[in-house]
Amino acid sequence: MGKVIGIDLGTTNSCVAVMEGTQPRVIENAEGARTTPSIVAFTDDGERLVGQPAKRQAVTNPERTFFAIKRLIGRTYDDPLTQKDKGLVPYKIARGDNGDAWVEADGKKYSPSQISAFTLQKMKETAESHLGQPVTQAVITVPAYFNDAQRQATKDAGKIAGLEVLRIINEPTAAALAYGLDKKKAGTIAVYDLGGGTFDVSILEIGDGVFEVKSTNGDTFLGGEDFDNRVVEYLTAEFKKEQGIDLTKDKLALQRLKEAAEKAKIELSSATQTEINLPYITADASGPKHLALKLSRAKFESLVDDLVQRTIEPCRKALKDAGVSASEIDEVVLVGGQTRMPKVQEVVKAFFGKEPHKGVNPDEVVAIGAAVQAGVLQGDVKDVLLLDVTPLSLGIETLGGVFTRLIDRNTTIPTKKSQVFSTAEDNQNAVTIRVFQGEREMAADNKLLGQFDLVGIPPAPRGMPQIEVTFDIDANGIVNVTAKDKATNKEHQIRIQASGGLSDADIEKMVKDAEANAEADKKRRELVEVKNQGESLIHATEKSVSEYGDKVSAADKGAIESAITALRSALEGEDAEGIKAKTNDLMQASMKLGEAMYAASQTEGAPGADGAASTDEKKDDVIDADFQEVDENERKKRA
């Protein structure tokens, strides 16, 4: 048996590694580099370039140079994120015959699996050159949040490249394998993986050679490419302001800007300021134009702050699903080139409350983990057991449109689960099994993966036939569903292969809708409560001003009236925090009024003051309550 290699097929760069004895080794490519740009280009004379040679000529050949192809793999052409990507890349994204997103050069269409296969071939050749023997088998990594279609498309890419893909492994899990290989201590780790195109976070328990994934979460359209694009947007906006020329329609200029943006981003990880100089970026009637400006780290951080913050919510969800708090995480492992950014490290440290572990190379650790898994499958690595999970719940539609889960998200894979259902009507001779993926209680709110019919059920009263539905998820995360009539033993099987995969928007909708609906309701309730507080305070303060306004100075009275006006203005908006702040300002401003009221009540022998003071006491009466929908397990399930 030949060597099994481990490949990290990345959005921006790819890397290949192999086990040498008991140690994994990253293999240098023909150019002497340990990583290879995931870029494929076609020249004027039809030559295909892969890696660094393709990257070098990208500026002069933008329409035939394909990068960040991983963002299209397993997606349909109509996917909103495909449409978004069309506006971000200089090459043409076209509709494939099967409705998937493909790319086009010189009138010829290529599937993302094909383009990815060219990069995989380069990785295969790199390994063969080092090992001096043919390589036919590999372990390939994918983002943990990749869906079934994206995993299938990645396996297809391996096949096109001449590789038998023995296992598809999740990137954060691979990183954990590499991190934990030589470490004897047990513990709970978080892998924060912010790569070129995708973000994943996984919580794992490690001990005695067992790597058990407790939960995973992520965003399949968030990564370094987006950081680069923010810089490009800033540069084009500044240039338009200065020169009045829009560079966004100039593909050559955009490609130069993209390269400059990536270079500036990398420099700003170690420097606090960098200079971007692009002479002859364009020209108009008055002559050539040059772009030259300084970009500070602070400005760059402000441009991408929301992107960095977007990584925190998946971290929060992963912790919740794993049933652990941030303080219970023993180590945070950073993976992906974008984690070199100081701001990212700072945000991770603030969230987890500890300095992230920087002992692994973020560009190589995933490929090393893939090589370790290859070693496990080959028998070279002993005493290592990897237990991964499925990222979303799977189930079927039952009577009344209810989504009945058979396999919950974050269930360890491989797994198999069966459940017996029955008919909804008398003498029903067929049932339609509709397979869904998601977290909502009603099937229609989730993603339909596929459907099939089980026919030939013998006539019987409703509720009598016994139909066994079995879900089977293999170690690659790929789904099979079987329905069987227990009376006749007739069965029908479907391998879930969505034509274009799930969109990122769909996945976010599935996971978020169940939890975020509750979160949105909570936020709406909080807004109503702070508005009520603000309005009550205005009413009480105005009443007090009319009664005791002559007891305070004109300056104090003016401050109170200004604070009332500011709060009224805030109440017209939807910003709860802003309303709270203005409410607090009015409380502070009306303190003098409270003192005057108290003094007056003392003089009059009154028992105490009312109005603004009483509102002050009540400002913390808001009770926040999280709630969860509880599934009725005893509910009778019928198909």
Curated annotation (Swiss-Prot):
Q: Which UniProt keywords apply?
A: ATP-binding, Chaperone, Nucleotide-binding, Phosphoprotein, Stress response
User: Modified residue Phosphothreonine is at which positions?
Assistant: 198
Under the heading InterPro entries, the entry gives: ATPase_NBD, Chaperone_DnaK, Heat_shock_70_CS, HSP70_C_sf, HSP70_peptide-bd_sf, Hsp_70_fam
Induction of this protein: by what? By stress conditions e.g. heat shock.
**Acidic residues compositional bias: what residue ranges?**
623-632
Picking any one GO molecular function of the record gives:
unfolded protein binding
UniProt xrefs under Pfam families: HSP70
Indicate whether Transcription appears among the record's keywords.
Answer: no
Region annotation Disordered: where it falls in the sequence:
598-639
Looking up CDD domains in the UniProt record yields:
ASKHA_NBD_HSP70_HSPA9
Q: Which NCBIfam families match?
A: PRK00290.1 (NF001413), PRK05183.1 (NF003520), prok_dnaK (TIGR02350)
Q: What does this protein do?
A: Acts as a chaperone.
Q: Which family does it belong to?
A: Belongs to the heat shock protein 70 family.
Q: What is this protein called?
A: Chaperone protein DnaK
Species name for this entry?
A: Methylorubrum extorquens (strain PA1)
